[in-house]
């Protein structure tokens, strides 16, 4: 009886937390659209968005320029930040379970390095219209290389995945730096630097379709996999004892994370540390059960990127910084904290 009561209480707390996070996310969307180099009245933002979504609201004295800024420039940008943040957080949650390592995120497999190499080649060759395609192909190539190297000894393990990801990451970054050193001019270098630090600038409504579809499908699938994730977190031997075909799920999850990350990176460049930070924050709120952790981490990731993008737009007047700077400023100390905590656990 007591266990049933405590279980129902945890479920109630979980539902309440989801409601709070959704409400905060909804409010954040309106606030984020209102903030920028040109400040927009929150009431005008509210009227423009809701009226465009079909609600019967009078536009009042909203100017055409305000309408264009809110609906054509900022709202799609904020929505893309939400989608990218949710997607990167999902990837981090899945990777930390798949390799049973709390410091794992999509980039641990060298996916970002592959995307960087593909984008760098596109920029150097003057193919700026296909930078996203180059980044996508580079990310997929890196993932294939990781899976091949990890399976070279016949049996892929979590350790072999991490080690092969480290090797591929170093190799692809070395190739990128070599190409930049021998073939880049000043304009290309600036383009590469800005792209590799991530940006949501210039987002249009047409940019939303592919990442929204991919993130939505991935969320619906991964949300049903919590039993497998929980088993993986207990270790390889425990998962095998429970009848989990680890090799199948490793290939499946790593491939899906690679495709998802490649789509997101191809859309907005490299935004690091999101997949590292938000799953840990979710664990602090709801524990380690992936039935609760996964949706909470997804919402936290969306919030994190939305507000990181706001900072990139407002911290310097009349200028915009890459969003990756702010995620790194938060993520790097967080990474050090996690590593320090793991070392203390080992010593004790």
Give residue spans per PLM region:
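Alpha-helical transmembrane segments in inner-membrane proteins
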Residues: 1-348
């Amino acid at each position: 009886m007591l266990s049933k009561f405590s279980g129902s209480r945890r479920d109630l707390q979980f539902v309440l937390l989801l409601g709070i996070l959704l409400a905060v996310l909804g409010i954040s969307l309106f606030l984020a659209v209102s903030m920028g180099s040109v400040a927009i009245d929150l009431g005008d933002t509210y009227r423009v968005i809701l009226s465009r979504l079909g609600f019967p609201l009078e536009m009042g004295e909203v100017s055409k320029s305000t309408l264009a800024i809110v609906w054509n420039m900022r709202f799609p940008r904020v929505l893309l930040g939400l989608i990218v943040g949710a997607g990167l957080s999902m990837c981090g949650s899945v990777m930390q379970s798949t390799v049973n390592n709390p410091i794992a995120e999509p980039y641990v497999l060298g996916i970002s390095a592959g995307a960087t190499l593909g984008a760098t080649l596109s920029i150097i060759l003057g193919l700026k219209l296909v930078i996203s395609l180059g980044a996508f192909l580079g990310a997929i190539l890196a993932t294939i290389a990781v899976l091949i190297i990890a399976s070279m000894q016949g049996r892929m393990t979590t350790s072999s995945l991490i080690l092969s990801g480290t090797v591929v990451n170093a190799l692809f970054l070395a190739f990128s730096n070599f190409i930049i050193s021998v073939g880049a001019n000043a304009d290309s270098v600036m383009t590469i630097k800005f792209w590799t630090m991530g940006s949501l600038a210039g987002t249009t409504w047409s940019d939303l379709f592919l990442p929204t579809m991919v993130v939505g499908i991935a969320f619906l699938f991964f949300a049903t996999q919590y039993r497998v994730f929980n088993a993986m977190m207990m270790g390889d031997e425990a998962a095998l004892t429970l009848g989990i075909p680890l090799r199948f799920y490793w290939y499946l999850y790593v491939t899906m994370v690679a495709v998802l990350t490649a789509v997101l990176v191809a859309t907005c460049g490299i935004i690091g540390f999101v997949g590292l930070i938000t799953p840990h924050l979710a664990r602090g709120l709801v524990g380690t059960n992936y039935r609760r952790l996964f949706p909470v981490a997804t919402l936290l990731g969306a919030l994190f990127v939305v507000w990181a993008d706001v900072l990139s737009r407002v911290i310097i007047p009349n200028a915009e910084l890459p969003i990756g700077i702010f995620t790194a400023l938060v993520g790097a100390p967080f990474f050090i904290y996690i590593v320090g905590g793991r070392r203390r656990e080992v010593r004790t």
